[in-house]
Amino acid sequence: NVPMQQILEAERLGYDSVWTSEAYGSDAVSVASWILARTTHIRVGTAIMQMPARTPTCAAMTAMTLHALSGGRFILGLGPSGPQVVEGWHGVAYGRPLTRTREYISIIRKILARKEPVTHDGYHYQMPYRGKDATGLGKPLKSILHGDPALPIYTASISSKGIECAAEVADGVFPVWMNPERFDLFEESLER
């Protein structure tokens, strides 16, 4: 259940944001959409949308649409999830989570910028797709929706390398399982 009365009270009290999540049941986007439709000024973010569950273009289209419909109140929170959920629930290879994060956010930023048709040649993603069973008909495309390049993108991390990755490509980070009393474990990564 979505605790809408508590969310509305948080909005009335001036809270800045509320966040939705997903694992292997309810998805974060539907809940975020519901909250955005029932509120007027609190920002709503996903903490997190699992990257292996969606293509970067699908995540970008979703984020652009929610950001536009909400008057700029949507925050895109992404994460690589974990191998148990990625391979067990989504049925795709876990691969290289930091590489996926860099590629995924790079593609989304290209889509939001709309400077040119999007191309990407990476470990996890090829745009246009040229791999096995490709028809050869795919061509680089540019979003027909004008997204906001300033749309905030956050990413989750469970390691110091993940914090470094977030600092490179994201606007914020969710330091999952970070013990505030052991901030020193991440301090060097944050300073880079």
Question: What spans do the regions from the language model cover?
Answer:
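Active-site-adjacent structural elements that line small-molecule/cofactor binding pockets in enzymes
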Residues: 1-192
